[in-house]
Amino acid sequence: LLEKLIPELRRRGYRVGVVKHHAHADFEFDVPGKDTWRMAQAGAEAVAIASPGKIGLVRRVEREPALDEVVTLFADSVDIVLTEGYKWAGKPKIEVSRAARSTTLICDPSELLAVVADHPLNLPVPQFDLDDIVGLADLIERRFLRTA
């Protein structure tokens, strides 16, 4: 869903950031054997790589940072931050539901901004088909991006 939503929001002129939650204690962001990977393996607390087109940062932490802490790392360079995961973060959520997996939602409807599904659900929130990226982007734009 995010891979379709990001280009639609960018087409509308918005700068989009994404934070993905990874539930496991460790992950590989860098390529094993490359300089930055070797520096991290050697014990660097933080490793950044910068080029004319990108910046990447990996920093060791003693506890999992809250979503708002992660967002502050790049919030000044984007118009909106979308997340994957962070069910407990207290932010408006868009849940994706596929009938082949389950028709039971994970989130309580009171936490939902919308549902994107391939099957009908009787909920008090907007529902979009899996392919209705324009409609979903319209909702996000109205709710979070347009200023009065």
What are these regions (language model features)?
Residues 1-2:
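Post-Walker A alpha-helix
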Residues 12-15, 44-45, 76-78, 90-91, ...:
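Short coil/turn connectors at secondary-structure junctions
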Residues 40, 48-49, 73-74, 86, ...:
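Solvent-exposed alpha-helices and their adjacent loops that cap or buttress functional pockets
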